[in-house]
């Protein structure tokens, strides 16, 4: 049996911010960061979100490799805890904006379609502690504010 794929088929790779970026220059922890802080032994070889695959520092090289092997799409996430400085006001963090703009620009320069996920293991731990996480309508409203940023 022979399979053929359409010429414009999306061949891609996927990851998420908490699983790839590392915690470099992040002002806030998310629940994934917190889980690693309290139970690092549960992570394979103790490797967790502190450095992860270092995408924060190596995204240009990583995305060039995607292009080199013929991939044309990439799914990742925008971390709420990296993009937003103040969760209540929705004020963006300049470094987070710079980073995600850089990732998007690099994808475009390499002919890679980017798909951005807005939530992947990154509920801000302080919103969980203060309001109870997703059970709180206020947290949902704050997420909507983040999504509109």
Predicted regions and their residues:
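N-terminal carbohydrate-binding accessory modules
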Residues: 1-71
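Substrate-binding cleft and catalytic face of glycoside hydrolase catalytic domains
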Residues: 24, 63-149
């Amino acid at each position: 049996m022979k399979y053929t794929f359409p010429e414009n088929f999306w061949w891609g790779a996927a990851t998420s911010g908490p699983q790839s970026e590392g915690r470099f220059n992040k002002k806030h922890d998310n629940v994934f960061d917190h889980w690693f802080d309290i139970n690092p032994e549960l992570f394979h070889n103790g490797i967790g979100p502190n450095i992860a695959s270092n995408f924060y520092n190596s995204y240009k090289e990583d995305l060039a490799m995607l292009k080199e092997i013929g991939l044309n799409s990439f799914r990742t996430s925008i971390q709420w805890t990296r993009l937003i400085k103040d969760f209540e006001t929705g004020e963006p963090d300049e470094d987070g904006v710079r980073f995600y703009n850089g990732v998007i620009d690099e994808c475009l320069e390499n002919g890679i379609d980017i798909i951005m996920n807005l939530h992947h293991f990154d509920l801000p731990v302080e919103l969980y502690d203060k309001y109870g996480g997703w059970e709180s309508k206020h947290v949902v409203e704050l997420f909507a504010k983040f999504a509109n940023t």
